[in-house]
Regions:
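Internal, well-ordered alpha-helical segments in soluble enzyme and binding-protein domains
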Residues: 165-168, 202, 206, 224, ...
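Alpha-helical scaffold segments in soluble metabolic enzymes
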Residues: 1-2, 40, 168-171, 209, ...
Length: 361
């Protein structure tokens, strides 16, 4: 990503990396499956091999995580891919955040409640007795009409305004002819002219919030879509690679000041993350079951192993029993990915502009 590429001293350090300037580090993450490269780098000793002694700390939500990186309370973190761009443009807290490594690709889905799905399903084409995927948001139109007649709003959850899930959800809705609303200089809610109302919900709260009836669906990373299926509360209607194949989802972010002051530490961190990501995708995902066991622990994602394994081991369940092969639902390094791409930065920036986060002037 253009705005996320290595800058300053980090890019100039010679191939033979010197000793880390700072070796005791604290990295933050959100309880999502795609934090797994950090957990693997820690549990497999890859950080220690680089002379780094890392503490991994779960954060309450994306805003808290981002603010703690900016303040220096965290040395780096698992971040939503658009976050460094949002910081550079001042859409969120103005800061210089760089991303030397992309942690994950694909990995998100859009899930709706059972009641919404039952209405949508009436207009969804069938193939072999099962709904044909990907499912267009056009199937939401009868639901919107029903809500309108009863004087209700269709409320959908996303994880952060300048985030992967907000922009993917908006893209899907608009492609199906449903207006997700706009941000404006005088209205930061993102609901200007909206037919569906989008609001922020922390990832681990997506399922409880839908169960309570506060939202009727959401866009989030795993395992919170598969948990809705397992609990019999909802049905995923789209996975993110159907919108943007191999699109960046999470990055590892640090402040530019940290990278400039600690170039060897930054490079050694990336080396450990590359090893972890390569391990995750090696031999057609052969190591994924072990990775699932690691992140199912309460200190990491803290979800049931079977729920995490649904997506991490190459399959994805839509309606209960409708499990389909999606080997790249979670992708970390296959195809020598990991490098921040200019094209990704451009795509995310166009979404910021499209929905009003970046004004015309």
């Amino acid at each position: 990503m253009a705005a996320l590429a290595l800058t300053g001293n980090v890019a100039q350090v010679a191939a033979a990396v010197g000793k880390p300037e700072k070796w005791e580090l604290k990295f933050g993450f959100i309880k999502l499956t795609d934090m797994v490269p950090l957990a693997v780098a820690y549990e497999k000793g890859y950080f220690e091999d680089e002379g780094l002694f890392v503490t991994l700390e779960a954060q309450a939500n994306w805003k808290v995580l981002f603010d703690r990186v900016v303040s220096g309370e965290l040395d780096g973190a698992h971040m939503l891919a658009p976050m460094p761009l949002g910081a550079a443009t001042g859409v969120i807290t103005k800061a210089e955040i760089i991303s030397p490594f992309t942690l994950s690709y694909n990995g998100a889905a859009i899930t709706v409640s059972n009641s919404v799905w039952e209405e949508m399903k009436k207009t969804v084409p069938m193939e072999g007795g099962k709904p044909k995927h990907p499912i267009s948001a056009e199937a939401l139109k009868p639901v919107l009409e029903s809500y309108k007649k009863s004087g209700k709003q269709l409320n959908l959850g996303m994880t952060f305004p300048v985030g992967t899930h907000n922009y993917l959800l908006r893209y899907w809705l608009a492609a199906g002819g449903v207006n997700p609303g706009l941000y404006s200089p005088t209205d930061a809610s993102g609901t200007v002219n909206a037919q569906a109302m989008l609001s922020v919900v922390p990832p681990p709260q997506m399922v409880p919030t839908m169960e309570a009836g506060t939202t009727a669906g959401y866009c989030v990373g795993e395992p919170w879509n598969q948990q809705a299926v397992t609990k019999g509360l909802g049905v995923p209607v789209l996975t993110s690679e159907n919108l943007w194949p191999n699109g960046s989802d999470k990055v590892f972010g640090v402040t530019k000041a940290f990278a400039d002051k600690n170039p060897n530490t930054t490079i050694r961190t990336v080396k450990a993350l590359i090893r972890a990501s390569a391990w995750l995708d090696a031999n057609n995902n052969a190591n994924r079951p072990e990775a699932v066991k690691i992140i199912s622990r309460p200190a990491y994602v803290g979800a049931d192993e079977k729920v995490i394994a649904n997506s991490m081991t190459g399959t994805f369940e839509f309606e209960k029993g409708d499990k389909r092969p999606i080997p790249d639902f979670n992708k970390f390094f296959r195809g020598y990915y990991g490098m921040p791409y200019y094209s990704d930065a451009i795509w995310w920036t166009t979404q910021m502009r499209r929905w009003g986060h970046i004004p015309e002037q």
